[in-house]
């Protein structure tokens, strides 16, 4: 009798989720996703650091004690003090103020590059994988040619051809990273296209465009979002490298790359200028990589076991 009662209890517990209301099922699913995010330390640490950097960039006019372009030739290369927490550069500009304002440029470049490369790469990769045929072959050939060049080298050539400006940096880095997003999107679309729910959509007469953008693309976005997040970190490095070489945002605009370039002349006597900007770049890149790893583990747990790192 006891065993029968236990068996009946198990059956009732197994059948309980089936009788759950749709609203409760959606709520429980949202709670499950929130628990996954909260219990992933890397994702939370990366997201927290990134949010702090964004807040610092937004509040730069309030947080920065001085203007990033104001010079004081009577107080050049000053060591850290209560007036200048990180000292001054060879033009008497406050290093801390320039670093705070420089975060704006780096985050603007990262955000713009992610938006442009994610949009273009998603459309190009989705159309190539879904259409197939000669269009797919042409896109793959062009994509492979662009991928054959290192991303930074391609961005360097494009900036040199267009001229040094913030718009040129964003355009060049976006063009360099779009093929990577397109390649990932195409490969995921090819795995989703033969699935049963796609064939069922075709059978009921759904248009190809609706199938692609309403069913395939949303299901293919998780790995693409991860690639875009990691690309944001690479975009910050690319902008800093281009500015360091004098091909990025031009002085006296404060960027982390320009600060490193300015401090390079006094690296032996006052290394804090270059070190502080380099540390900010490292923190931002590490935070974005931690965020990308966390999103990968949360959105697609099998991706880490099957393919390792995406980039």
Predicted feature locations:
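Gly/Trp-centered helix-boundary motif
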Residues: 1-122, 126-127, 134, 148, ...
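Hydrophobic core positions of alpha-helical segments in small-molecule transporters
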Residues: 45-49, 109-113, 139-142, 155, ...
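Alpha-helical transmembrane segments of multi-pass membrane proteins
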Residues: 53-57, 159-160, 173-180, 230, ...
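Structural signal for membrane-spanning alpha-helices in multi-pass inner-membrane proteins
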Residues: 57-61, 155, 159, 226, ...
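Generic hydrophobic transmembrane alpha-helix motif, especially the helices
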Residues: 85, 89, 119-123, 129-195, ...
């Amino acid at each position: 009798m006891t065993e029968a009662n236990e068996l009946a209890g198990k059956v009732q517990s197994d059948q309980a989720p089936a009788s759950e209301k749709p609203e409760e099922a959606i709520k429980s699913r949202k709670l499950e996703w929130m628990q996954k995010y909260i219990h992933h330390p890397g994702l939370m640490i990366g997201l927290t650091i990134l949010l702090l950097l964004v807040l610092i960039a937004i509040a730069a006019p309030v947080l920065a004690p001085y203007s990033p372009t104001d010079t004081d030739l009577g107080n050049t290369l000053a060591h850290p003090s209560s007036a200048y927490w990180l000292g001054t550069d060879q033009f008497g500009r406050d290093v801390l103020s320039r670093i705070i304002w420089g975060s704006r440029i780096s985050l603007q470049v990262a955000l713009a590059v992610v938006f442009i490369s994610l949009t273009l790469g998603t459309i190009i990769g989705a159309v190539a994988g879904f259409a197939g045929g000669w269009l797919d072959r042409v896109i793959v050939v062009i994509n492979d040619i662009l991928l054959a060049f290192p991303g930074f080298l391609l961005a360097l050539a494009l900036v040199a051809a267009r001229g040094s400006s913030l718009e040129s940096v964003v355009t060049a880095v976006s063009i360099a990273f779009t093929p990577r997003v397109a390649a990932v999107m195409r490969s995921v679309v090819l795995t989703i296209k033969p699935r049963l729910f796609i064939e069922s959509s075709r059978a009921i007469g759904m248009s190809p465009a609706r199938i692609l953008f309403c069913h395939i693309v949303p299901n293919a976005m998780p790995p693409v979002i991860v690639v875009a997040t990691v690309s944001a970190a690479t975009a910050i490095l690319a902008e800093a490298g281009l500015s360091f070489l004098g091909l990025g945002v031009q002085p006296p605009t404060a960027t982390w790359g320009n600060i490193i370039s300015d401090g390079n002349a006094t690296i032996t006597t006052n290394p804090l200028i270059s070190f502080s900007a380099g540390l900010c770049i490292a923190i931002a890149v590490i935070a974005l990589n931690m965020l990308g790893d966390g999103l990968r583990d949360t959105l697609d747990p099998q991706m880490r076991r099957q393919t390792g790192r995406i980039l």
